[in-house]
A protein has these predicted regions:
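Glycine/proline-enriched, intrinsically flexible loops and inter-domain linkers
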Residues: 2-125, 133-152, 156-655
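Glycine-rich phosphate-binding loop of nucleotide-binding enzymes
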Residues: 128
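Eukaryote-specific, cytoplasm-facing alpha-helical/coiled-coil scaffolding segments in long proteins
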Residues: 360, 417, 757-766
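Short Cys/His-rich Zn2+-coordinating modules
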Residues: 660-680, 711-722
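Extended intrinsically disordered, low-complexity coil regions enriched in Ser, Thr, Gly, Ala
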Residues: 678, 682-713, 746-757, 761
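Flanking scaffold residues of small Cys/His-coordinated metal-binding clusters
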Residues: 679-680, 727-730
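Cys/His-rich metal-chelating microdomains
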Residues: 691, 738-741
Length: 767
């Protein structure tokens, strides 16, 4: 049964109660609240640049203040926070450079407050609102916002806000990542925006209500004060700017920042063809004991200067794997910001004037209340965010200048959560999540290789935590942390490698562990335009090993495989299993996807990869078609013969292949071009002009199709049957004329071939 989209549900109230809050085009704001809207239009360039950069630095100082006051691993090492500045009516001026999806849900919170709090209890100078309701605008319950209106002479001038992940806010699982919850009623406290600061005084009754459900109230109270300090700092800096330059000038700068961002965005869109771009990915295991796979669809439609994002075809909400409307929207905004708004200091408001989000409520990433959403940022939101990189990259590829901005899906595209708790070395209770997967990897570019352990692209300034700091804070001893050979997706440009962290308990008798993951059977970092997928997430667990004897003898292992012991297969939502001092636990996070056909990678680059232990000799041959001699050189004749033989094997063997000879009008992807023939617009191979069908066709239907196990795409991908029942496959689509690789896709064996690119003929005919 087809479920309706938001745009088709005209009689439904999207007010953040049952359905996620969808701000109307015109907000209903109480007349009690006076808004400062006057803005100077004539601002000299020097003043504009000074104030513009000052506002950016207000945001940076806001985030740094939270880090300094909190001092927690969440703020200092995970950088699981982000500040924002918004106009009086909730348009973004700036995102912060930390965890950017946190800002992506901020404008919905601010607009909801304007609509539902401006009358009662009112919005006044000296107030701040606390909020973590995902149906109003939060990633999940643990990401708490402190939202501060900034007033000037009795009028609401703008908003400064921040969001910070909290240690624990209740629920059935310590840390509040409730991987077995079936509804929000089993998760942490859920708070629609509530006035926690009134007249510059903390309301003790609201703070005590907020802290009561937490297992770590002291830590949450400290982080609340860190957020408070951040908002106060940002508010004071904005007021100082107003005092120096005047409210009209500062507001005028804000308006111009947004207007300039809009103009830059429109200029880019006008250079791109109209069309539809689709990405398909999968989530595994929505609750403990589940072996299912769940489809996640992203559709991007471009018509003129308007973009529309949809999720039609995504699986219905289920188990503990969901996200809300604001989470899905905020995730996509991160990719939109980084690929199309990076030159505007992450000011996405101008772009948002021309972007619509039209998901299907009741689905996995647009769930209705009271779905379980506490795991959203590490599962549902990541699987919503990362495919947007590929869809947007394919859209902008046709423009030679914008092609330089393309970035494939990065590492940790599904977070392999290792949630641990117990009593630490000081006999104090603790609970936390291993932050190491933040090290991620950056996807390949259209112009070069990705970045190994380069972080998560959703967090531009993220950093890998120090092993020593983790050991100091928690009762763990790391055995090693290393990059994983062959983990990056193969391609003309290789995706960045991911890494593996391995640890044992230290100065404690037992650690209670939970797993919470997806992307362990089906890779969630596929390549693009012929690039191969990266490795999956991997849990490795060995019981009763000889590690303590090795440590005593000063013989540290280089890998968990070096140890004697019992191998245990951990499931993706396994709860309350124990790790004792002789038990060794290793976690590998997914790497980044590759760009372009691996057979087109320079052989010398592959040799360097082998020298650097980025690629094994076997993978050099199997994936890249490069023969490495015993003394480490490239066997040039052997490499040419191997590559030519593979291309020849993938050509069409029966019948003649038509070649197009008309006008080549558009380079759609690295491997696909558009021709104008006498018979109309047709698609073709970029290498040999072999006919791949009319523009209205799915080009894949005209390719030679090969289907194989996922291990042929990446040697580190293991047996899917450990976790799921549906068989995933690696599909490849080759040119029938020359055997060149046109595109790949990862899919369940029974799923239809994806039409990932659909140019609109009217637009295509103009080019």
């Amino acid at each position: 049964m087809t479920m309706p989209k938001v745009s088709q549900m005209r009689d439904i109230a999207f007010d953040g109660r049952k359905m996620g809050y969808v701000p109307p085009k015109k907000l209903t704001i109480s007349p009690k609240l006076r808004l400062q809207r006057k803005a100077a239009a004539d601002i000299d360039p020097i003043t504009y640049e000074v104030v513009r950069h000052a506002l950016w630095h207000v945001n940076e100082e806001h985030g740094a203040t939270i880090q300094r006051v909190s001092g927690s691993p969440v703020a200092m090492y995970a950088l699981d926070l982000n500040p924002s500045i918004l106009t009086e009516d909730g348009e973004f001026v700036y995102f912060g450079p930390y965890m950017q999806y946190m800002s992506g849900v901020t404008d919905t919170q601010v607009k909801w407050i304007l609509e539902y709090r401006s009358d009662n209890p009112g919005i006044r100078d000296g107030d701040m609102f606390l909020a973590n309701d995902p149906w109003v605008g939060a990633a999940h319950q643990q990401d708490v916002m402190l939202i501060c209106p900034v007033f000037w002479k009795g009028e609401l001038f703008c908003w400064v806000t921040n969001c910070l992940h909290q240690y624990d806010l209740g629920g059935i699982t310590p840390s509040s990542f409730c991987g077995s919850a079936e509804s929000a009623f089993e998760e942490g406290i859920c708070i629609p925006p509530v006035k926690i600061v009134e007249g510059n005084e903390i309301r003790r009754d609201i703070e005590e209500l907020y802290l009561r459900s937490s297992r770590k109230p002291e830590a949450v109270a400290l982080d609340f004060r860190a957020q408070l300090a951040g908002d106060i700092t940002a508010r004071d800096r904005v007021l100082a700017l107003i005092g120096r330059y005047g409210p009209d000038v500062v507001k005028g700068v804000m308006r111009r920042v947004i207007d300039n961002a809009e103009a830059a965005f429109l200029k880019k869109l006008k250079r791109l063809p109209d069309g539809v771009w689709r990405e398909r990915s999968y989530v595994e295991c929505c609750r403990p004991g589940d072996r299912g796979t769940y489809c996640v669809m992203l559709t991007l439609r471009k018509t003129g200067t308007k973009l529309v994002f949809e999720n039609e075809g995504t699986a219905p909400q289920a188990g503990a794997m969901n996200a809300t409307y604001s989470g899905w929207r905020g995730s996509i905004m991160v990719a939109l910001n980084q690929l199309l708004c990076w030159d505007q200091y992450f000011c996405i408001a101008g772009a948002l004037r021309h972007v619509e989000f039209d998901p299907t409520p009741g689905t996995f990433n647009c769930a209705n209340f009271p779905a379980s959403v506490s795991t959203a940022p590490i599962q549902a939101m990541e699987i919503s965010l990362y495919p947007a990189y590929n869809a947007l990259s394919k859209m902008i590829h046709s423009d030679p200048e914008m092609r330089n901005d393309i970035m494939c899906i990065g590492g940790t595209s599904q977070w392999p959560a290792t949630i641990f708790r117990g009593t630490d070395q000081w006999d104090e209770p603790y609970g936390y999540i291993l932050v190491d997967p933040i090290g991620g990897a950056i996807g390949a570019f259209a112009t070069g290789d990705g970045i190994s352990t380069g972080g998560q692209s959703r967090t531009p300034i993220c950093k890998l935590p120090n092993v020593e700091h983790t050991e100091q804070t928690f009762p763990l001893l790391f055995l090693y942390r290393k990059e994983v050979i062959d983990s990056g997706g193969a391609g003309r440009y290789r995706g960045g490698l991911s890494a593996e962290s391995c640890f044992i308990p230290h100065h404690t008798g037992v650690i209670t562990q939970d797993t919470l993951s997806s992307g362990n059977a089906i890779p969630t970092s596929p390549g693009m335009m012929g690039g191969y997928p990266a490795t999956t997430n991997v849990y490795k667990f060995k019981r009763q090993t000889d590690i303590l004897e090795r440590v005593a003898a000063r013989r540290m292992p280089a890998d968990i495989a070096d140890l004697q012991g019992e191998d245990v297969t951990l499931q993706l939502r396994q709860e309350n299993f124990e790790q004792r001092p002789g038990d060794v636990y290793a976690v590998i996070w997914s790497a980044a996807g590759g760009f372009g056909d691996p057979l087109e990678r320079e052989p010398e680059s592959v040799r360097e990869d082998v020298d650097n232990r980025s690629v094994s000799i076997a993978a050099a041959r199997d994936l890249y078609g490069v023969v490495i001699t015993p003394d480490g050189r490239v066997d040039d004749p052997g490499t040419r013969d191997l590559r030519d033989g593979r291309r020849d094997a993938n050509r069409k063997k029966d019948g003649r292949v038509a070649r197009l000879k008309g006008e080549r009008t558009l380079r759609i992807t690295d491997n696909l071009v558009l021709y104008r023939e006498k018979t109309g617009l047709r698609l073709a191979c970029s290498k040999c002009a072999a006919d791949l069908g009319a523009v209205r066709d799915n080009y894949k239907d005209h390719c030679v199709r090969r289907e194989s196990d996922l291990s042929t795409a990446n040697p580190n991908i293991g047996d899917y049957r450990r976790y799921i029942d549906d068989r995933p496959v690696f599909r490849q689509f080759f040119c029938p004329g020359c055997g060149a690789l046109i595109e790949n896709e990862v899919a369940r064996a029974n799923d239809p071939v994806l039409r990932d690119i659909e140019l609109l003929p009217r637009e295509a005919s103009k080019r």
